[in-house]
Amino acid sequence: MSILPIVTAPDERLKQKSQPVLEFTDQTRKFMDDMLKTMYHEDGAGLAAVQVGVLKRILVIDIQDHDSVARPKDFYPLFIVNPEIIEKAEELVTANEGCISLPEQRIEVARPESIKIRYLDYHGKSRELKANDWLARVIQHEYDHLEGKLMIDYLSNLKRDVVLRKLKKLKNNIV
């Protein structure tokens, strides 16, 4: 497994909509394994393919140590391909979020408290999942990436511009 390079804002790829995975191959699964290794390396809770420069509708998630629900031992990591959000709670919950593609930024985001998704798993099998609390938040955050939306898009234009300037400065100091 390889650690993949992270795409950070203001890279334009992060604003593009990802395309569905049409074929499940060993290469697809190897890529998902590489995404997972990369997410762990970055201490992330989730990662979307676009965050490693691939515009495909693939998410990996592992919040095993922070999940409020007791789940089977083999539940995590989650490999979520071509997800669709099929239900959303009306109740919104605001919480602080971070993002691997927005280093050193924390932003308050209001999201539905629970969701239900339909997706393909690691083996291409169709599944449905009801998620609430932190898992629902992480899925929605990563799903936003597939739609070309970042957590800073929930901010006012002024606040978003301030964050983008900070990120540009940070990127220039690293390179």
UniProtKB/Swiss-Prot annotation:
Co-factor requirement: Fe(2+)
Top enzyme category: hydrolase
Active site: E142
NCBIfam families the record matches: pept_deformyl, PRK00150.1-3
Family: Belongs to the polypeptide deformylase family.
Entry EC no(s): 3.5.1.88
Domain of life from the UniProt record: Bacteria
MF terms (GO), sorted A to Z: metal ion binding; peptide deformylase activity
SUPFAM superfamilies per the UniProt record, alphabetical: Peptide deformylase
Cofactor mode of binding and number, as noted: Binds 1 Fe(2+) ion.
Function: Removes the formyl group from the N-terminal Met of newly synthesized proteins. Requires at least a dipeptide for an efficient rate of reaction. N-terminal L-methionine is a prerequisite for activity but the enzyme has broad specificity at other positions.
GO biological process, any: translation
Matching HAMAP family: Pep_deformylase
Residues the record lists as binding Fe cation: C99, H141, H145
Swiss-Prot/TrEMBL keywords: Hydrolase, Iron, Metal-binding, Protein biosynthesis
Keyword Metal-binding tagged: yes
Pfam family, one: Pep_deformylase
Reactions mediated catalytically: N-terminal N-formyl-L-methionyl-[peptide] + H2O = N-terminal L-methionyl-[peptide] + formate
Protein name in UniProt: Peptide deformylase 1
Keyword Transmembrane helix assigned: no
